[in-house]
Amino acid sequence: MTNVTIEQAVKGYLVFSAKEGKLFREGRSYLAGKTYHNRYLAIYEKLEDAVVNASQYPSEEGITIYEVSGWGQVTDFGKCKVTEWLKLDQIVAKKEWVALLGKQTNSNYASLRILAARLSEDAAVLKKLAQDKNQQVRSAVAENANTPALVLTKLGVAAEVNAMAI
């Protein structure tokens, strides 16, 4: 654990739920705004680590990952840094982090991958998930069959999803 000074401001990524208006870090949440004053907000240096954090909240809608900067007192915890002051710089495009989720084979990521695909109407991701070799992933597609029918029809997977749901 290392503290860095204001001159060593940190850039990184942070997970946010637009629906709840909260920021997430290890199960705790905080009210959101443009700038935050809370020493427990985590900034992940790598987008991959922020995506892993986001995958802990698969039932949340409107999950967003922000590119952020922190300044003031910053504590280094290795994969993440905790800062007293935090500024939202920009939203990371969903395509970027959905692609990282797609590289994960663990079925725990399935619900978030489906949610992200539905929100972005990423047909390729949905189709791939519907044909995944992992039964749990296919089941998660079936459980999330409220994906817009038009999208599923375009994919040609509506029949597969309905069959799995039965």
PLM features per residue range, with description:
Residues 13-15, 44-46, 50, 63-68, ...:
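Hydrophobic beta-strand residues in large extracellular and virion-surface proteins
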Residues 3-6, 36, 65, 76, ...:
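N-terminal compositionally biased, intrinsically disordered segments and leader/signal-like regions
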